[in-house]
Amino acid sequence: MTESSPSPGIRASLNEAGELVLTAMNAPPEAVIRMDVNADSPRMLCTQGRYLAPVQAPPGARIRFRLFRGKRGITPPETFIMPGPPPARAVPSTLIPCTQDRDFMIYDWASRHEAACRIVRETHPNLLFIGDSITHFWGGAPVDEPHRDILQKSPETWNLCTAGMRAVNLGFGYDRVENALWRLRHGELDGAKDNAVCVVLLGTNNLAENTDGEILEGIRAVCRE
């Protein structure tokens, strides 16, 4: 009698820093964990960001996660609640850094993040544009293949406006403030000049879910990075 293989799953644990660590168990090599934090309304986890690093979230935060192969879930959705009493004032989502994958049809968020980190390390830019699709679709590096024609709306004006500067485009389509905060805390500024100028244009994609004050708090957190 042939012994069946163990079913895939996800192990959730806390590291010494109190961050949530998610580990895929018995999973195929191409499987990825997708997750969200404090989702107030049901969202399809297949469009949420990949788990790429331990999750920083306040006590009481709800982290949903599921293992996917492509966009098909291969484990049931699970929820982990961060231990400890929740703060008296709920921490807005704009201050909880997380990944996303809402624009997966035209670009890969995680791959663009890796490319941006590499370019910043190698070129030591002195001008960085941090934003969402309005910035992303302008021009400049990194370039998302194979959709260059869709995502590079005006490379000529980018070249004109950044002439003489080592500029990097840190705009990511459909990013909310908390997604940019995650990116900056995970390497996208590592290697930039100490006196680099950062141009921040964020918040549009938060308007449906956050108050103006919450968006402002998140933008301030981004600027402090």
Range-by-range predicted roles:
Residues 63, 125, 165:
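Residue-level detector of short, conserved catalytic/binding motifs and their immediate flanks
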Residues 30, 60, 124, 193-195:
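A general structural motif
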Residues 128-130, 168, 198:
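Conserved beta-strand elements of the Class I
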Residues 1-4, 83-160, 189-193:
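N-terminal secretory targeting modules
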Residues 1-87:
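Short, compositionally stereotyped local motifs that mark structural "simplifiers"
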Residues 47-48, 76-77, 139-142, 211-213:
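Short, solvent-exposed loop/turn and secondary-structure capping segments
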Residues 152-166, 175, 181-225:
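Alpha-helical cap/lid subdomain in secreted, periplasmic
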